[in-house]
Amino acid sequence: MELELLNEQGQAASKVDAPDTVFGRDYNEALVHQVVVAYQANARQGTRAQKDRQTVKHSTKKPWRQKGTGRARAGMTSSPLWRGGGRIFPNSPEENFSHKVNKKMYRAGMAAIFSQLAREGRLAVVDSIKVETPKTKALAAKFKAMGLESVLVIADEVDENLFLASRNLANVLVIEPRYADPLSLVFYKKVLVTKGAIEKLKEMLA
């Protein structure tokens, strides 16, 4: 599989050979969907909680007598039918949202995403991404010159200057290959991979 190598103006300067095991796989929509959903589910904190009729603050006093008033019978004000009452099926921190995905499935799903991005022209290669100073303005100007607005950069090494310069850009994420995830790959409009990162991705996903 050949990928475009971009220059500093964002134009295709040449081609770079990339492993077919990572960038030449067939697209498996069902597998990609499963991998993305599992990633989102496993990222949940699972701390949401609501109160049921037992835990909501209430009085155990019967609101009115059982018969003779003409109104519907009521036992206590914590009933889910009442305003201020508990929930019938409350959310609980004990809920388990985790989804298990086998390692082979995850690797195949990631490779399918990389391959589809390459086919759509949303993935390109650069020699390296470096900035001399930890200034956001410098990195923003570099991406503007390349015509990139929403970009995920997978660099073989992220130094301190690059990390500090990129962290305040809303539509830019700079990561090392080991931190690549399916949601980020799908979310950003363009994915830039450095030459050194290609080999690391091959070791991870091939």
UniProtKB/Swiss-Prot annotation:
The gene is rplD. One of its GO terms (molecular function) is structural constituent of ribosome. Gene3D superfamilies: 3.40.1370.10. PANTHER family: 50S RIBOSOMAL PROTEIN L4, LARGE RIBOSOMAL SUBUNIT PROTEIN UL4M. Keywords: Ribonucleoprotein, Ribosomal protein, RNA-binding, rRNA-binding. One of the primary rRNA binding proteins, this protein initially binds near the 5'-end of the 23S rRNA. It is important during the early stages of 50S assembly. It makes multiple contacts with different domains of the 23S rRNA in the assembled 50S subunit and ribosome. Residues 56-70 have a biased composition (Basic residues). InterPro entries: Ribosomal_uL4 (IPR002136), Ribosomal_uL4-like (IPR013005), Ribosomal_uL4_dom_sf (IPR023574). The keyword Repressor does not apply. It comes from Methylibium petroleiphilum (strain ATCC BAA-1232 / LMG 22953 / PM1). Part of the 50S ribosomal subunit. HAMAP family: Ribosomal_uL4_B. One of its GO terms (cellular component) is ribonucleoprotein complex. Belongs to the universal ribosomal protein uL4 family. Transmembrane segments: none annotated. The keyword Transmembrane helix does not apply. GO terms for biological process: translation. Residues 44-77 are annotated as: Disordered. SUPFAM superfamilies: Ribosomal protein L4. This is Large ribosomal subunit protein uL4.
